[in-house]
Amino acid sequence: MTSATTWRYTSGMFKTIIEPFKIKVVEPIRMTTPEERRAVLQQAHYNMFNIRAKDILIDLLTDSGTSAMSSEQWAAMMRGDNAYAGSNSFYRFEAAVKDLTGYAHIIPTHQGRAAERILFSSVCGKGQIVPNNTHFDTTRANIEATGAEAVDLVIPEGKQPQSRHPFKGNIDLNKLEALLKDAKPGQVPLCMLTVTNNSGGGQPVSMENLRQTGALCRRYGVPFFLDACRFAENAYFIKLRESGYQNKSAADIAREMFRLSDGCTMSAKKDGLVNIGGFLGMNNADWAQQARNLLVLTEGFPTYGGLAGRDLDAIAQGLQEVLEEDYLKYRLRSVEYLAERLDKIGYPIVQPPGGHAVYIDARALLLHIPPVRFPAQSLCSAIYEHGGIRTGEIGNAMFGRNVEGKEIPSDMDLVRIAIPRRAYTQSHIDYVVEVAEHVYKLRETLHGFRVIRQSPVLRHFTIEFEPV
């Protein structure tokens, strides 16, 4: 591994890394006032998911499905073949995914959670265990819906926001081996690794950790799958931070990552650079047939999987563009740029910055708000009220639990500032910094929330709050 001081994204003799694209189509932003936004918050019951897009100046809730597509992707969409069976678009899509992953079976889905549902419904059941570095929300929910248990085994540094470990997304190999060793035959149907680790700050997984995880799984006869939503960002982190990879291309590194595993789930709405789509890839023919049977039942025929032909062609093109190194250099530097400025203001953030978002440690910032009063939700609300910026809560609302009316807090309360790909410029980010600085000065005046309504599963999408 290289030292942190060499992680800089330099570009020749100039320090400024420009957006490696020109803007061809624009969408107007409607300006709003703080008074309007306070009314919007009340109407939305302080849930960021309930705010309408027309009331948002800059939308940093998620990087999923919010990318701007390229002219080449739009051109590819015109080739879209919408044949119900045997679509030409599918075979172009399949060829692109196989070239990247090397998997024998590629099954399109309308997005990543559909791939998760099909996979886990096929192979998981009551009493089984699925380990991961950290399961994201839909992954955990789809596993638990089968009666299985989702177990998080990220290394200790992954739960320490200020730790500068270069690969905080790594799975704890000792804990993984202990789990596999103690499990009954068939109790662990598969092992997952999320690259990058979204719930832990968008932190990467090293190639060595991927390699050793695969070796452990083979030793115990357990299939090894990736949650590959942000595979390209992970590959570029490996290039920057892991010894022996500096002179390898991001594309070659990504191919090596996939070939260490037996399969993956993928939301193409992230590193596929599209607005909808995903896939399930694997080498096991029996599992693939089970998955296709479920696909036909709920998604569609195996050569379209709930997607139009144009979407399949856009994904095929996006998977090539996302591995262009000028783009990846700009992408990671954009996140680092925001992180540096928030850090300078005084915000406690997850260090080092991840690949798709900056994560503020709201629990550390708002010490006067206890975890059961949702400090991350408080910060999200303040950032929207004062600047019209929508961010995401990755904390107690998303990962905490309510057991018989008592809140069981999550490990961390983070505010995720996720940057959509190729959608905003540096001026937008500079505005975000100004708003964040204003809110920072008001931090001691922020209040907590109590829950007034919630769902039993994935409650953060529909939860309703009131101030306390």
Per-region residue spans from a language model:
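Short beta-strand-to-loop capping motifs
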Residues: 282-283, 360-362, 419-421
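Short, conserved charged micro-motifs
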Residues: 288-289, 367-375, 422-431
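Conserved PLP-enzyme active-site core in the AAT-like
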Residues: 7-10, 14-48, 52, 56-67, ...
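Short amphipathic alpha-helical segments
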Residues: 276, 356, 413-417
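PLP-dependent enzyme catalytic core of the Aspartate aminotransferase-like
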Residues: 9-11, 322, 398-468
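A short, surface-exposed helix-loop junction/capping segment
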Residues: 71-78, 362
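Conserved small-domain helix->loop->beta segment predominantly found in fold-type I
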Residues: 303-381, 385-411, 446-457
